[in-house]
Curated annotation (Swiss-Prot):
PANTHER family: LARGE RIBOSOMAL SUBUNIT PROTEIN BL17M, RIBOSOMAL PROTEIN L17. It comes from the Bacteria. The gene is rplQ. It comes from Rubrobacter xylanophilus (strain DSM 9941 / JCM 11954 / NBRC 16129 / PRD-1). GO terms for cellular component: cytosolic large ribosomal subunit. One of its GO terms (biological process) is translation. GO terms for molecular function: structural constituent of ribosome. The keyword 4Fe-4S does not apply. Belongs to the bacterial ribosomal protein bL17 family. The keyword Ribosomal protein applies. InterPro entries: Ribosomal_bL17 (IPR000456), Ribosomal_bL17_sf (IPR036373). Pfam families: Ribosomal_L17 (PF01196). This is Large ribosomal subunit protein bL17. Part of the 50S ribosomal subunit. Contacts protein L32. Keywords: Ribonucleoprotein, Ribosomal protein.
Amino acid sequence: MRHAKRGRKLGRDAAHRNLMLGTMAGQLITHGRIKTTEAKAKELRGVVDRLINIAKRDDLHARRQAVKVLKDKRVVRHLFEEVAPDLDDRTSGYTRILKLGPRQGDGAEQVYLELVNHRVE
């Protein structure tokens, strides 16, 4: 029975899942919006919210924690210098999910996951 089991496995082992979520978090921070499946977006929401809360502290340890997840110092710099200061007035809820409908090939529910301060050009 799955009582009190948190998180989704997304059909991957732990290392693959963590690397995928870190990469997707970096893409979301860089571009402000990504298109993905609903299950991945719901799992990624928590990762990004934690990263933004870490970035709000803006100290050396916070940067090292962010690099541990994101693996790219340029993305970390963007997170700390541009994204986190814009979201400083919020305590949580940094992302939103916009449903797009099922994918043509396999019927997986597609969504946009975006930062709430993202401006669509």
